[in-house]
Amino acid sequence: MKKDSFRIAIVSGKLGDVDGVSLEADKWIDILSSQGHEIFTISGFYRQPVSGVPEEQQILLKSISFDSAEQKYFETLVFPYLSKRPPHFTEPRMAEIQAELEMAGAEVGNHLYEIVQDNRIDVIIAENTNAMPMSLLGGIAVYRIATKHRVATIFHHHDFWWERSRFSENYIEKLLNLIMPPSDLGTEHVVISSYASHILKSIKRVNPRVVPNCENFDNPAVPDDWNADFRTELGFAEDDLLIVQPTRIVPRKRIEDSVRLLGRFMEAYPELADRIRFIISLYQGDEMDENYINDIKGLARRLGVPLYLIAERVASRRDKDTEGRKLYTTRDVLIHADLATYLPVWEGFGNAFLEAVSCKVPIVTTTYLVYKTDIQGVGFKGPEIRDRYDKDGRLEIPDSVLVKMHRILTDRPYRDKIVEHNFKVGRKEFGFDTLRKGISGLIEDYSDEIRASRRRLSKSLTSYFV
């Protein structure tokens, strides 16, 4: 290895999946590897193997999984909104539960530190472990090795627990304030938007570095032998208008607004209605809500919007399922899309937006907060819907948006002009050059602490005999 290269471990509750954290971790691994660093992964669950990391360096630590028995046990006790019938505890009992939680986290921390020692890890990059309590034991474990053992730690925050109603009401706020995220000297913090940077500075008094979500515009998705049959494989005709929602099915994505948008469009342009196919490409994710899925299905049925849930055929990398059927990536799906919808009420950044841009797909989006602070101003073109909601909580959709959608779907030169412009803007502002600069600057600025951590770890491995 080069003199200034490091052994880096990516730590996450889950990797190899299609959620935003997993996808960004994949990109960081790609960049870090290309810069000469040796990469390890430590995860509670691998949906698929992580590309670019040797199998023997993909370490499974089940206790930090989002679905571990310990996580399910503790989260139902400390987050009342996660239960239909939340338990009630006396203060002494709650103190016992927190002590039990911290003890379990400490045990996981000891195991994690052993992994760091055994593999001589110089620095860990903690992917959202100390921002969102999807893995309470993982968050405690990372906090302990960063503060007790002083292992060089970069906290990569994608979103925060206080932004989620299901976590904002809790019985362990003091603990969460301490570890999610911590503000200890010697650690480094990275956020994905200027808005998150402002909030973290205000709340935690730390000065995070902003490295936005980026997309690989240098290697854009193109039609090839693997994805050429996507339409026929999934039962779509060549002249069907595929409207793709390239997100997981969770309430903050406001998929009901996308359904209403298409219902309005089909009513306004009945000559195109029979060709509309609304596709949701990803699964529920880690914010399970069966009622929400049923609500979406029911709304689509009432409005006559043909709805297709194809998550079982979409994965983070190309493969085949147990029945021998092709698994397509989100990019494979998007290059067959005629239009994408992306109408969230809240997003940490906007992976789906950038994926659509990189695949040269026009996209209808809301002007959600981070879009306004970090994306809107760089010059993308396309239909935008202001984030205004009526008294019933429905997105207010102006007729002008329907007109723009119609032109995109019926005027090919106009569509091509938009997507080519957006591709150039995306490549300049959110391409891998931006990511390379952000990551290399981060590692360079933190390198003294990483080297000090390497020396401390080396000393910890020394045996002394008396």
What are these regions (language model features)?
Residues 170-221, 225:
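A short, active-site helix/loop in glycosyltransferases that binds the activated sugar's phosphate group
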Residues 396, 400-403, 409-443:
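A charged, aromatic-enriched C-terminal amphipathic alpha-helix characteristic of glycosyltransferases
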Residues 362-366, 371-376, 382-383:
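Short hydrophobic beta-strand element within catalytic cores of glycosyltransferases
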Residues 10, 236-253, 259-264, 278-279:
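Conserved donor-binding/catalytic core segment of Leloir-type glycosyltransferases
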Residues 1-62, 148-151, 457, 461-466:
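N-terminal subdomain of nucleotide-sugar transferases
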Residues 345:
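Aromatic "clamp/platform" in nucleotide-sugar-dependent glycosyltransferases that forms part
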Residues 2-4, 31, 38-123, 298, ...:
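A conserved catalytic-core segment of Leloir-type glycosyltransferases
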Residues 282-284, 290-333, 379-381, 386:
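Nucleotide-activated donor-binding/catalytic signature segment of Leloir-type glycosyltransferases, i.e.
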